[in-house]
């Protein structure tokens, strides 16, 4: 499951957009 990196990036992006 190499989606951990994507999830981290997505979470970071979400926080930035907030």
Swiss-Prot record:
Part of the 50S ribosomal subunit. The keyword Ribosomal protein applies. Keywords: Ribonucleoprotein, Ribosomal protein, RNA-binding, rRNA-binding. It comes from Serratia marcescens. GO terms for cellular component: ribonucleoprotein complex; ribosome. The keyword Ribosomal protein applies. GO terms for molecular function: rRNA binding. It comes from the Bacteria. This is Large ribosomal subunit protein uL24. One of two assembly initiator proteins, it binds directly to the 5'-end of the 23S rRNA, where it nucleates assembly of the 50S subunit. One of the proteins that surrounds the polypeptide exit tunnel on the outside of the subunit. Belongs to the universal ribosomal protein uL24 family.
